[in-house]
Amino acid sequence: MKKLILTLTLVLGAAAPAFATWSVIAIDAKTGQVIIASSTCVRQQGFPERKPNGARDLMDVQAVIVPGIGVAACQAGVDNTRENQMLVYNEIKKGTPPAEIIEMLKKDPNVERRQFGIVSIPNGKTITPQNNRAGFNGSGNSRSSLYFGGSYGDFYYQVQGNTLLGDQVVHQAALAFTRAKGTLADHVMAAMEAADANGGDHRCNCGNNFTPELPCDNKTSHVAYIAIANKDDQAGITHNDGKYFAYIAVGDNDLKKGESANPVKTLRMRYNAWVKAGSKRTNPPGPTPYKPAATTSQQ
């Protein structure tokens, strides 16, 4: 009986409830810059508590970043063992096309609770609308769970989300990406704001605002971030612990006076401040508690 309980605990811990709700992944085929941004109605305090591997924050468990080649989001019933994330990471580094990586992920017995989005330059040199992106949405996810992507000039992107207020969250985010002006990061931020403005995560609203001293601003999530990696940035040992150009995050535990309880609006404030200061390289996020079992094979 004890063995059975332990087994069930490990299974449930590895296939935990949704972390990420919506995310935007993008790559500049000309420069090799890759970006991921995301927001969710999971409080910051919940990430270190995950089993069998805790997480520093949303980005730590969700993002897969390979500078100059590709970026991915692993979300919904997130894999807390990190096996899926590391598989995606290693295959992107090899130049495996996104659609083939998705087929590999389908071997996971819990795949119907997962959601994946991948955008990459398959051979590290060329990119086309047909070979550069792929997504998967498990049948066990909620009704409004989907992905949609496309391109705008040299920018290739995909938006994916689950437990959303409606399909318009993803579609309006994608539309905003294509209508935005400026840098790749500007396009990603526009998509993030559109997702938030169109309902975001249906689990969050001003009724569960944990920072009543700040304006709620129609919040649809608790945490948000954007991570930017340039082509020459150093990749990591894990799927996202490299030395990337910029990382801006908002948690429900680090809000300041003058900011918003809506993390996407505060992310915009912090992003604008970063741009105004010259868009300089930021300090990396703190260390990840996740340690791959065989780091020598992940280099």
Locations of regions flagged by a protein language model:
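Bacterial N-terminal signal peptides
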Residues: 5-17
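N-terminal nucleophile
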Residues: 19-299
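Sec-dependent signal peptide recognition
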Residues: 2-7, 63
